[in-house]
Amino acid sequence: MIQPVKEKIILGIDPGTTIMGYGVLRVCGTRPEMIAMGIIDLRKFGNHYLKLRHIHERVLSIIESYLPDELAIEAPFFGKNVQSMLKLGRAQGVAMAAALSRDIPITEYAPLKIKMAITGNGQASKEQVADMLQRMLHFAKEDMPVFMDATDGLAAAYCHFLQMGRPVMEKGYSGWKDFIAKNPERVK
């Protein structure tokens, strides 16, 4: 008997406080296909809390549009500006909360791991990552976004696709109960 090919939708997010990128992959068997990529433009919001609300609303809207099975999100890198890191962490947390509210499992990937998975070079530029994705997913140069944040979101999804079927060291959560069970020290 022929088994039907399993389809999986992966949403990838590149968190940001000015521009947040996302990409959506459909995986049929072992073949990935880009079905969307774009940005959430937060530049018009002066208040950080309004940005967080907009991130939550837009991520939920993207989830409702594409019905992803899993979320791959880029983990914040460690920078020198503590305030910027705090705001970026909040933005990432709000995007994760939106996915968790729909019981979507989440996996975080370090920027270096994503770049390494896509280009073979952990120090690759955003342009090199975008160019490699364009070649691997066969989308037209004209479809290349103005903001590389969109291809960074797509890169997170593609990195997750490459990790499917392999043991993953990063923490993944299937919902709030799973998060609490794996992180009791973080809950008061």
Curated annotation (Swiss-Prot):
GO cellular component terms given for this protein: cytoplasm; Holliday junction resolvase complex
Keywords, ordered alphabetically: Cytoplasm, DNA damage, DNA recombination, DNA repair, DNA-binding, Endonuclease, Hydrolase, Magnesium, Metal-binding, Nuclease
UniProt: Mg(2+) 1 binding residues: 14, 149
PROSITE patterns reported for this sequence: RUVC
Subcellular location: Cytoplasm
Cofactor: Mg(2+)
Reactions listed under catalytic activity: Endonucleolytic cleavage at a junction such as a reciprocal single-stranded crossover between two homologous DNA duplexes (Holliday junction)
GO terms (BP aspect): DNA recombination; DNA repair
EC number: 3.1.21.10
Residues where Mg(2+) 2 binds: 74
SUPFAM superfamilies: Ribonuclease H-like
Active-site residues, as the UniProt record annotates them: 14, 74, 149
Cofactor remark from the record: Binds 2 Mg(2+) ion per subunit.
A GO term, aspect molecular function: crossover junction DNA endonuclease activity
InterPro entries: RNaseH-like_sf, RNaseH_sf, X-over_junc_endoDNase_Mg_BS, X-over_junc_endoDNase_RuvC
Family in the record: Belongs to the RuvC family.
Role noted for this protein: The RuvA-RuvB-RuvC complex processes Holliday junction (HJ) DNA during genetic recombination and DNA repair. Endonuclease that resolves HJ intermediates. Cleaves cruciform DNA by making single-stranded nicks across the HJ at symmetrical positions within the homologous arms, yielding a 5'-phosphate and a 3'-hydroxyl group; requires a central core of homology in the junction. The consensus cleavage sequence is 5'-(A/T)TT(C/G)-3'. Cleavage occurs on the 3'-side of the TT dinucleotide at the point of strand exchange.
Quaternary structure annotation from Swiss-Prot or TrEMBL: Homodimer which binds Holliday junction (HJ) DNA. The HJ becomes 2-fold symmetrical on binding to RuvC with unstacked arms; it has a different conformation from HJ DNA in complex with RuvA. In the full resolvosome a probable DNA-RuvA(4)-RuvB(12)-RuvC(2) complex forms which resolves the HJ.
Protein name in the entry: Crossover junction endodeoxyribonuclease RuvC
